[in-house]
Amino acid sequence: RAANAYQFAYDSYMLVKAAKEAWDSGLLVHGLLQFLNTPPYIEFARYLGSDASITHTAAQCTRYRPGQYLMPHEDLDENEGRRYAMVINLSRDWRPDWGGQLQFLDGDGSVVETFLPRWNSLSLFRVPQRHQVTLVAPWAAQPRHAITGWWLAR
């Protein structure tokens, strides 16, 4: 199906849904979502993004295993009010030949920029912007882990 239409294959843990439905309350990652929505952090997001309309953050935990990917898309969601997308990379010692790279595309679909998912790095970009995560190679020795989210305005 991916040859003819937008597709993705990766594992996710939806932090906002988990918080609303009280899943796994003991997981430390729930504290991260709370932090990403504190007034000081939202002020930081507004400052960094030069966007006073940012009101909150939505996030998910993502894991890309060998053979998984995210096809080109723009993260546009009018109902959520996405302003910026963010990726907090959590994979140690990631190698370029393992794939899983965040790539930005121009209007013709050509790659114009590529970012390796380096440990403890933040990728932040304005939405909409065409991008993809390349296929994680079958020989990748570990999954690609990240916290992926959006700065929202409502």
PLM feature spans:
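Catalytic core of Fe(II)/2-oxoglutarate
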Residues: 59-154
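Short coil/loop residues immediately preceding or within conserved phosphate-binding loops
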Residues: 56
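Catalytic cores of PAPS-dependent sulfotransferases
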Residues: 37-50, 64-68, 92
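Non-heme Fe(II)/2-oxoglutarate
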Residues: 1-41, 47
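Generic serine detector
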Residues: 12, 25, 50-53, 91, ...
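Generic ordered-secondary-structure signal
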Residues: 1-10, 44, 53, 94, ...
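Short, conserved, surface-exposed binding loops centered on an aromatic residue
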Residues: 34, 47-53, 75-80, 94
